[in-house]
Amino acid sequence: MLRNKNLLVAAIICLCLSNGNTTFGKDVGVVLAKIPDSDRAALPQNKNAEANFEQGNNLYKQGDFKGAEAAFRRAIELQPNFAQAYIGLGNTLDDQGKPQEAIAQYKKAISLDPQDSGAYFNLGLTLARVDQLEAAIAQYKKAINLEPKYAEAHYNLGNAFYAQGKLTEAITEYTQAIRLKPDYAPTYARLGTVLYDQGKLEEAIAQYKKAISFDPKYADAHYYLGNALYAQGKPTEAVAEYTAAISFDPKNPAGYNALGNALYAQGKLENAIAQYKKAISFNPKYADAHYNLASALYAQEQLPQAIAEYTQAIRLDPKHAQAYTGLANAMDDQGKPQEAIAHYKKAISLVPNYAYAYYNLAITLGREKQLEEAILNFKKARELFQAEENKEMVEQVDQLIQKINTRTN
């Protein structure tokens, strides 16, 4: 019986590239010119407070967060009701990895100036970063209520909805953000990703291409476009996009991993192996890259090397069901069926609807003359393949069950 060799890890089509460009950043434009009402609480009456505030802004923009923090604190000390200084202080604290302290400062700013949409927006960003999505959504909505044309708030509200799996709501917000700020490339990329998740590949591709038209060096958009093309069964075109993504972001391991998968799909195993190794060189703890490298080595029948990589993938990600299946395949090929059976069962315990794990387990059990258990696993595999509308594998399972029944009768 021929066993199905396991597929490349599906993680290549997740959003595993850097998301550094996928949020509009904080509202750092807390300069006085942005405040239209001269009688608002945010305006400083103390010139020294204003000078320290401006110094804080300048230092923040230069990346000197400690210096900016000190300047904003001096401004607040000189004028305790200086709402914009609290926002600036919150920004510096957040960028220093102190989100809870930042949240407190944004809330203080809001208490002093409840009409400042930027304070709600920045509070929303920080809450989202600490996975308080419902609270973040509430703040983005408050910002939008105060400023309906606030593109950044619509965009990040879309991000929060996407993180909650609310794709329709995310599309609505991204579409609104595009209407308000049509030249911001990441919005198109994010909209494309939602469409991708809905299985609308052509529409997703159109959005990724729009993102690239506004920012030709946008590595993430090239990467996502590559994923969509790969999903369409166009590995050659995917290779071109992954190569572009790598050229613009040469230290990001996800690009190399994805390029490796596209090359694997073209049957270029040596080239694929080289890309997986590059991915691992940039991130030695990249479990999926170790798994994919193992799969390529397995395809070359380099069993000891494949086993080493599958084992490493499992060490890095103990819930990596595909790695257990791959390891089981290699063990079985080495004449270690009992170890293989144990690994297949581990994969199934992690992913109970893993059709290929049941299928491969059944083959090994059949070879070991454990025919009753083999048939049970074949039937489970068939049920799952049927649900996936995988007619080819359903027919293959039927043939194997028939062979076992013929042999036992």
Where are these regions (language model features)?
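Helix-start (N-cap) detector for alpha-helical repeat units in TPR-like alpha-solenoids
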Residues: 49-50, 83-84, 117-118, 151-152, ...
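Register position in tetratricopeptide repeats
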Residues: 61, 95-96, 129-130, 163-164, ...
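Terminal, low-structured helical/coil segments at or just beyond the last alpha-helical repeat
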Residues: 3, 10, 29-41, 367-409
